[in-house]
Amino acid sequence: MKSIIDVKNLSFRYKENQNYYDVKDITFHVKRGEWLSIVGHNGSGKSTTVRLIDGLLEAESGEIVIDGQRLTEENVWNIRRQIGMVFQNPDNQFVGATVEDDVAFGLENQGLSRQEMKKRVEEALALVGMLDFKKREPARLSGGQKQRVAIAGVVALRPAILILDEATSMLDPEGRRELIGTVKGIRKDYDMTVISITHDLEEVAMSDRVLVMKKGEIESTSSPRELFSRNDLDQIGLDDPFANQLKKSLSQNGYDLPENYLTESELEDKLWELL
């Protein structure tokens, strides 16, 4: 499958006189339609990397190619039209007095008719389950509802790439599951490429590949299953998945379980076989 993002030998530091790089000579790609999770400890370079991809920061060296176009100062605004970002705190993204005004805001500079704008706003809000709240003030929404509205604002723009920068980190477990389910549906309906920066295991499990960053460099790239089989997850800012913890406990008590990582549903099926 063709890559929609190619990052080659990318380096960046926030201050020219600092003796270390925040992102150091990284190279990776993202396939069209893929869900890539980026994980690692705070300060490992995750958020800096996606801000470089979106053109919010300018690299010191290396190149970024988005859908065949090399990112430059001249085309950064055109390339940004292909990318939508949702951040950790949705309050920083709200500009409209109502939910529907906020979702419509980004469409106003696209030369769309009022009818098309209204259609896109309602489709996006329906997709994230927030159509009934379109007249509500954003400040009166819960954290999970605010994040869904923020995603609706991005989806209405029809970007090819959706970047979630720790978008689920401030939500409770139920809110996280709902938001991850929403993103899963959007990806399927719009064939969207997703990059998520996260510490959430459920979010990582939904992805096709996982890129681990450490001290500004790429430590490894693997499938979620391969990642969860590692014994050093705490060293890269992740907890051991519950299914892994349970499997280890059961194995210690005499249950013959396979060595490879099992999802919770796979573990449940295996236990039924053993009982």
UniProtKB/Swiss-Prot annotation:
Role according to the record: ATP-binding (A) component of a common energy-coupling factor (ECF) ABC-transporter complex. Unlike classic ABC transporters this ECF transporter provides the energy necessary to transport a number of different substrates.
GO molecular function: ATP binding; ATP hydrolysis activity; ATPase-coupled transmembrane transporter activity
EC number: 7.-.-.-
Lineage of the species this protein comes from: Bacteria, Bacillati, Bacillota, Bacilli, Lactobacillales
Keywords, sorted A to Z: ATP-binding, Cell membrane, Membrane, Nucleotide-binding, Translocase, Transport
CDD domains linked: ABC_cobalt_CbiO_domain1 (cd03225)
CC terms in the record's Gene Ontology section: ATP-binding cassette (ABC) transporter complex
Amino acids binding ATP: G40, H41, N42, G43, S44, G45, K46, S47
Full protein name: Energy-coupling factor transporter ATP-binding protein EcfA1
Subunit structure comment from the entry: Forms a stable energy-coupling factor (ECF) transporter complex composed of 2 membrane-embedded substrate-binding proteins (S component), 2 ATP-binding proteins (A component) and 2 transmembrane proteins (T component).
